[in-house]
């Protein structure tokens, strides 16, 4: 590509778009959302170099986050990657190689489209939509539904194991950590010999976990 540019002094738009799509070329843009600088250039670059994805007709979704709303209801965040998800649809993790005792089937109770803290309930979410779903208790981040592969493999693995030292009831700490483990399965919370153990990336994650537990 560089040789072609040196020879002709120009590059075909199609070649640049193809390289961006294949993650071989990374455009670098500058701007400030606060000052509304460079926003139009960013949108134009997205229009030119990020062609719309063609989604399959069969339903598929990838869970990427678990959180809780102000009332404590569990929110399972997912991106629909095929077909459409409708309120009251029955979702399952069933695969040919999934042990029967690990199979779950649950109803997507409510579909929410969030904007900050506010949300709008919708009846359906087409492919390409990011939606928060209530009613699911066992879906975890990284899990695929429908035509998606069962799990995405994390790029990083925690290598530090921490044993909690607390004067409080360890069972209460375990319960709180189990809720946080739903949001981040890599915590790998375990209970052994009366002690709670978690796996973390380092001091920064340790501080974040401590703050979340205090909250």
Where are these regions (language model features)?
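Structural and coupling elements of P-loop NTPases
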Residues: 1-215
